From Swiss-Prot:
It comes from the Bacteria. GO terms for biological process: L-histidine biosynthetic process. SUPFAM superfamilies: Ribulose-phoshate binding barrel. This is Imidazole glycerol phosphate synthase subunit HisF. GO terms for cellular component: cytoplasm. It comes from Marinomonas sp. (strain MWYL1). Its main location: cytoplasm. Belongs to the HisA/HisF family. Its EC number is 4.3.2.10. IGPS catalyzes the conversion of PRFAR and glutamine to IGP, AICAR and glutamate. The HisF subunit catalyzes the cyclization activity that produces IGP and AICAR from PRFAR using the ammonia provided by the HisH subunit. The gene is hisF. InterPro entries: Aldolase_TIM, His_biosynth, HisF, IGPS_HisA/HisF, RibuloseP-bd_barrel. Keywords: Amino-acid biosynthesis, Cytoplasm, Histidine biosynthesis, Lyase. The lineage of its organism: Bacteria, Pseudomonadati, Pseudomonadota, Gammaproteobacteria, Oceanospirillales. GO terms for molecular function: imidazoleglycerol-phosphate synthase activity; lyase activity. Pfam families: His_biosynth.
């Protein structure tokens, strides 16, 4: 029996509001972060991810007081990302009540930071977030590249190789977002999800593109993901967490109901 699979609603926070964009650009308001997080906690989400989406690109620190406010209302694991660049940033987030931190852009510029963070705080709280885009042409072997700064800057790094390297350096989890799928509601990029899930021995969280509950099922069964992350299908009331868990259970996936 494997570990139960997880459903993780994601709060993309911009200037103190939960927002949801399409391919990281076109933004729509989804409410107050503390209220939204509280609702998911009550609905039975397994974890919550809070991403300060302006932090890295605008070089702004993640809002510590908001993390404190969410942590005081939420009793499931909370991952916080956005603008995490130093061990001091990590310490502040963990002290504010985060259980894990997501490192994205900073890992690309300074991979040693991941090693240092894992040694200091433990791999269990270090999540490396990977934003990948498919770069292979039709008919070529599949290849995905890492992008930074909210999907705007290509790095030349191969996504699968990078994931393996980050796990070697101490990442305890990989949060994989397909930039091609983000906000499209067409489902996860199952190719890159499966490639990375099969390449590393730590949990992989699939993100980017969920439009219905069957996409969550596909992420686990076909994509081999350990957890599935979604935003807009939950934020705007199309589906509840319980409906999602029921659909996944019906498909034979072990869930915490």
């Amino acid at each position: 029996m494997g570990l139960a699979k997880r459903i993780i609603p994601c709060l993309d926070v911009d200037n103190g509001r939960v927002v949801k964009g399409v391919q990281f650009v076109d933004i729509r308001d989804a409410g107050d972060p503390v209220e939204v997080a509280k609702r998911y906690n009550e609905q039975g989400a397994d974890e919550i991810t809070f991403l300060d989406i302006t932090a890295s690109s605008d070089d702004r620190e993640t809002t510590v007081h908001m993390v404190e406010a969410i942590a005081s209302q939420v009793f499931i694991p909370l991952t916080v990302g956005g603008g995490i660049r130093t061990c001091e940033d990590i310490r502040r987030m963990l002290n504010a009540g985060a259980d894990k931190v997501g490192i994205n852009t900073a890992a690309v510029f300074n991979p040693e930071f991941v090693r240092e963070a894992a040694q200091r705080f433990g791999s269990q709280c270090i999540v490396v977030a990977i934003d990948a885009k498919k770069v292979s042409a039709e008919g070529e072997p599949d290849k995905w590249e890492i992008f930074t700064h909210g999907g705007r800057k290509p790095t030349g790094l191969d996504a699968v190789e990078w994931a393996k390297k980050m796990v070697e350096y101490g990442a305890g989890e990989i949060l994989l977002t397909s930039m091609d799928r983000d906000g499209t509601k067409n489902g996860f990029d199952l190719g890159v999800t499966r490639a990375i899930s099969e390449a590393v021995h730590v949990p992989v969280i699939a993100s980017g593109g969920v439009g219905n509950l069957d996409h969550l099922v596909d992420g686990v069964i076909e994509g081999k993901a350990d957890a599935v992350l979604a935003a807009s299908i939950f934020h705007f009331g199309e589906y509840s967490i319980q409906e999602a868990k029921q659909r996944m259970t019906d498909a034979g996936i072990e869930m915490r109901l």
